Amino acid sequence: YGFGTDEFIKFCRRMKTEPFLVWNMGTGTLEEAAAWLEYCNGTYDTYYANLRRKHGHEEPFNVKYWQLGNEMYGVHELGYCKAEEYASTAREWAKTMRRLDPSISIAAVGGGHEDIDRYRVVLEELIPLSLIDYISIHSYWGHREKSKYEGKDAENFYQVVAEPAISEKLIQEVACMISMIRRKHKDKDTRKVKIAYTEWNAWNYREGAGLHPSIKPFEPAYHLREALSDAVFLNILQRNCREVTLATVAQPSFPGILTSS
């Protein structure tokens, strides 16, 4: 790979977008995560801030949005853990990062669609301490088996187009959960936690995603069915804009990131 932090920040600035970085809670360490934050946002005479300067960036990147791991609720992830373990670790990581840079916005990982109770465990641990600004949700909808790509199967077509409604129900459930927990701790000046939809899209892959492109290529197939499904979800985001204040589509493609080596 020839595309690292410096190149990503440069790309974001060129595209006039705000970077959103994810700390590696699966196989990484708290020290590595803190070093990354120091590299990006540090202003003092410290090792990683000076390393950024050495790389030609005198001013800090001022990366605002950070997430505590990725899909730690999924057994497919390296570092998968139970809700209580994730919440406990996220608490300590968030405390550390807030002390390093109080200006950042931190997102914790929820529980996908399968485990609504996991959201409760994480939020009850982190909201009373005002450690997070967002709870992250990921949603994909579509045919789970090899699809008829031209959309001739009417049942499959309507299934894909209608499935975002499940995501809207999840938004409302999580938003209600946040409100109830904040009300429970109304004696504390807790942060107004919002929802960050950090991955969303129609899920239609020719053979499903493999563990590595050399084993099974990552080949999304998008047609009118998927376009309508995404259009439905864009309307859902509009309807729930008070609860969902950050959303990023997946999977984006950056061919320039990969190199022949």
Protein language model annotation of sequence segments:
Residues L129-N156, V160-E207, F233, G256:
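Extended catalytic-interface subdomain
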Residues N62, Y73, V161, L258-T259:
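Generic, ordered loop/turn and secondary-structure boundary motif
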Residues G4-E18, T96-S103, E173-K192, F233-V244:
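A structural motif corresponding to the C-terminal end of an alpha-helix
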